[in-house]
Amino acid sequence: MEIQINTLAAETFLALYSSAGWEPPCIGQIETALQNSIAAFTAYDGGRAVGMVRLIGDGGMSFYIKDFAVIPEYRSKGVGTLLLRALEAYIRGRIPADWAVSLELISTIEAVPFYKKTGFEERPCEWDGPGMFKMLRPEGKGENDGIS
């Protein structure tokens, strides 16, 4: 298994994203997201892309895990752990050793045990409230069309 950094093409992203069962955005939106990511990590097995994760954030205090996907036949085989280790090493290699930074994400229900096993805490917890999420959709295309 090989982890590559910043080689993820939009078409590969689309295939991996779709393998997770998520409705994919258009190629233009994917290209913009990849260009504006801090880094993108792709797991390859013999040249075949089998997993990915993007890192976004401010580069100093807060980092966010986005679009973490592993194709179904490679799940529970260590691919996600390898991707996460590469992502964490990347962050640690780019910040001063005495900085504490947050690494955040929104998990699917099914992935909660994986994240807990790798050191993440569910929210709410004793010291923090729940994570929040809001999808901004095109005007007139669904809920949350604006602030009331």
Name the predicted role of every residue range.
Residues 42, 48-57, 61-64, 69:
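Conserved beta-strand in the GNAT
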Residues 93-134:
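Conserved active-site alpha-helix within GNAT-family acetyltransferase domains
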Residues 8-12, 60, 109-113:
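Short alpha-helical
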Residues 74, 78-86:
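Conserved acetyl-CoA pyrophosphate-binding loop and the N-cap/start of the following alpha-helix
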Residues 32-42, 99-101:
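A short helix-loop-beta-strand connector motif used in the catalytic cores of GNAT acetyltransferases and
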